[in-house]
A protein has these predicted regions:
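Glycine-/small-residue-biased sites that favor an extended, beta-strand-like backbone
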Residues: 4-153
């Protein structure tokens, strides 16, 4: 086996190994990105819980102030217009909480979808590296055959 053959084989092996490492690295990067995105989804859900708690706190203050103002005016708190205002406020509060939950769920679902795509992108990178490795094997083999055309390979 001549020096050219040894060089060709050596370079083919080096290229094959490098392609494998690049594929694994790219897959690892995308898997890490997926974990970051998944954690962001969890944070969005936790933020929604916090936002609802803060909203409830603010709503209770406003509700209390409204009851005090109504009582000071001499109106009966649990009847008539005051009752309907309180009922309307309670309805709006529930609507606002549902809106906070909905928006957080949509944002978290979007992050999870991005995470899924990152994993898929990593798998594609790994598959592309494997295909490149196969191409390297084929090219190296073809080069060796071309170089040794007409001579006996021992």
């Amino acid at each position: 086996m001549g020096a050219a053959n040894i060089f060709t084989i050596g370079m083919g092996v080096a290229q094959y190994n490098a392609q494998g490492k690049i594929g694994k690295y790219n897959q690892g990067v995308n898997n890490r990105n997926a974990k970051v995105l998944e954690n962001q989804a969890i944070q969005l859900e936790q933020k929604a819980e916090f936002d609802i708690a803060q909203f409830n706190k603010s709503f209770k203050k406003i509700e209390g102030s409204t009851k005090v103002a109504t009582a000071k005016s001499g109106a009966v708190v649990d009847s008539g217009s005051a009752y309907y205002v309180a009922l309307s406020n309670a309805y709006e509060a529930e609507l606002q909480k549902k809106l906070i939950e909905y928006n957080a769920k949509i944002a978290a679902d979007n992050k999870r979808e991005e995470a899924t795509f990152a994993i898929i992108k990593g798998q594609i990178a790994r598959n592309q590296a494997s295909l490149a490795q196969l191409q390297t094997i084929a090219t190296t083999g073809s080069s060796l055959l071309t170089m040794n055309k007409g001579s006996k390979i021992a």
